[in-house]
Regions:
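Class I SAM-dependent methyltransferase SAM-binding "motif I" and its flanking Rossmann-like core
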Residues: 67-139, 181-184
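Short hydrophobic/aromatic-enriched beta-strand-loop microsegments
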Residues: 28-34, 85-89, 108-115, 164-171
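Class I S-adenosyl-L-methionine
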Residues: 1-91, 191, 203
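Alpha-helix capping/helix-boundary segments
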Residues: 16-17, 69, 96, 151, ...
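Small/polar loops that bind or transfer phosphate-bearing groups
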Residues: 12, 92, 121, 146-147
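A contiguous loop/helix-start segment that scaffolds small-molecule binding in enzyme catalytic cores
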Residues: 55-60, 116, 124-225
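Short, acidic/turn-prone active-site loops that include or flank metal/cofactor-
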Residues: 15-17, 32-40, 94-96, 116, ...
Length: 225
């Protein structure tokens, strides 16, 4: 909030909670979000904007959702700005692979159930499913996949080919927001559930026994299924 309040310019992403923009009372605000098939600006254009606006406006805030260093291009943007002698600082965020399961009482690690977890992108820079998903599917770890909705059929097929058990799986769309939607099923049932409840991006996919062992919360975010 302090950073946004003191900004001369705010460049914000598609997944940012826009309520934060109310604190930018003295700043020019530019949307630079990128969603599947729709880019307001390319990454190169965003990099150039950061530099040009820092030189002409002063204090630029690059407002991102979650953690800018988990599939967020944060390091790339800082490295680019640093080439031009622009001073940078970071306000850490909570990445959706941790924040969204926690808000739904899903513990990514649990004693005797899951000793570790993977966080994997569902879409590489070549628009292919990450090879790490195949490796993770053979482990006992909890697996969290971001940007994977368009690859859900491939993910399900990998698990069906690599395992004999029918693991629990949760898909949470618009996590932590009032518009959140959630379905819980298994590898064999999830595709039909997603179609039935019309889930789409942005959503995270959580695969593992911890999904079945989610704690019971005393309150829930509005909009859950």
């Amino acid at each position: 909030v302090q950073a946004v309040e003191s900004a001369d310019l705010v460049l914000y992403d598609a997944l940012v909670n826009e309520e934060l923009l109310q604190y930018a009372k003295q700043a020019e605000i530019i949307f630079v979000g990128k969603r599947f098939g729709c880019h307001a600006y390319s990454q190169d254009q965003i990099n150039d904007l950061i530099v040009s606006m820092a030189k002409s406006k002063g204090h630029v805030v690059r407002l991102k959702g979650g953690d800018p260093f988990v599939f967020g291009r944060g390091s790339e943007e800082i490295d680019f700005a640093s080439q031009f002698g622009i001073e940078t600082a970071v306000v850490p965020g909570i990445s959706s692979p941790m924040g969204v399961p926690a808000s739904n009482a899903i513990s990514l690690t649990q004693r005797h159930i899951a000793e570790s977890f993977w966080v994997i992108t569902g879409k590489t820079s070549e628009h292919k499913l990450s090879k790490d998903v195949a490796l993770a599917s053979k482990s006992s770890a909890t697996v969290v996949i971001l940007m994977g909705m368009n690859k859900l059929d491939e993910i399900v097929a990998l698990y069906q080919n690599n395992r004999t058990d029918d693991l629990p799986i949760a898909i949470i769309q618009n996590g932590t927001r009032p518009t959140q939607k959630k379905v819980i099923g298994t590898i064999n049932s999830i595709t039909a559930l997603v179609e039935e409840h019309k889930l789409a991006s942005p959503a995270i996919i959580i695969i593992g026994e911890v999904v079945e062992n989610a704690s019971k919360l005393t309150s829930y975010i509005e909009g859950e299924l």
